């Protein structure tokens, strides 16, 4: 059991028979009245985001989430196929289950797929990925006095802000939690 006052981003709970992940939360202490916790919850099966308010002492059952290492195989235009690295079982997932992660995933990359009661609901890429820049504007000397950034498209199609010295063909390391450039590899 977890109290609403202990919510953190990423915590998965059961509310009214459905499973939600806490996307955002805020402890509110009004001048008058009791404190409360305002949350944004994402339904893990449907992807719908709702806002709910709870008392900080209200308790919820934590949902048991199974995590499995799986290899991303390919996309057939509609579904994304992943293979369990231990059993070699393949599972297809539609776009709404992979939408946040797919911009950082290349074919054959190993990712974490989350399951609830045997059904896959989310894909988590590695925390740091190395991808090649396929399109960016050339950076010129003297463009700026204090550094700066420019947009760059990587091989998966994601657009990342990178320093001016990054060129097409460079491999860069990206933090998938924030989508930020970390370093040139």
Curated annotation (Swiss-Prot):
One of its GO terms (cellular component) is cytoplasm. Keywords: Cytoplasm, Elongation factor, Protein biosynthesis. The keyword Cytoplasm applies. HAMAP family: EF_P. InterPro entries: Elong-fact-P_C, NA-bd_OB-fold, Rib_uL2_dom2, Transl_elong_fac_P/YeiP, Transl_elong_KOW-like, Transl_elong_P/YeiP_cen, Transl_elong_P/YeiP_CS, Transl_elongation_fac_P. The lineage of its organism: Bacteria, Bacillati, Bacillota, Clostridia, Thermoanaerobacterales. One of its GO terms (biological process) is peptide biosynthetic process. One of its GO terms (molecular function) is translation elongation factor activity. PANTHER family: ELONGATION FACTOR P, ELONGATION FACTOR P (EF-P) FAMILY PROTEIN. Pathway: Protein biosynthesis; polypeptide chain elongation. It comes from the Bacteria. Involved in peptide bond synthesis. Stimulates efficient translation and peptide-bond synthesis on native or reconstituted 70S ribosomes in vitro. Probably functions indirectly by altering the affinity of the ribosome for aminoacyl-tRNA, thus increasing their reactivity as acceptors for peptidyl transferase. It is found in: Cytoplasm. PROSITE patterns: EFP. Belongs to the elongation factor P family. This is Elongation factor P.
């Amino acid at each position: 059991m977890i109290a609403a006052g202990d919510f953190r981003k990423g915590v998965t709970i059961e509310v009214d028979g459905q499973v939600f992940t806490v996307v955002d939360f805020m402890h509110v202490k009004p001048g008058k009245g009791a404190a409360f916790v305002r949350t944004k919850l994402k339904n893990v099966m449907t992807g719908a985001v709702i806002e709910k308010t709870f008392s900080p002492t209200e308790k919820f059952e934590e949902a048991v989430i199974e995590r499995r290492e799986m290899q991303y195989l390919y996309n057939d235009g509609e579904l994304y196929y992943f293979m369990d690295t231990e059993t070699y079982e393949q599972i297809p997932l539609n776009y709404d289950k992979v939408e946040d992660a797919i911009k950082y995933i290349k074919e054959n990359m190993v990712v974490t797929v989350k399951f609830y009661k045997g059904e896959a609901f989310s894909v988590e890429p590695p925390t740091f990925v190395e991808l090649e820049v396929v399109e960016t504007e050339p950076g010129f000397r003297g463009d700026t006095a204090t550094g700066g950034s420019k947009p760059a498209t990587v091989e998966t199609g994601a657009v990342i802000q990178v320093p001016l010295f990054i060129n097409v063909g460079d491999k860069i390391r990206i933090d998938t939690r924030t989508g930020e450039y970390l370093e040139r590899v």
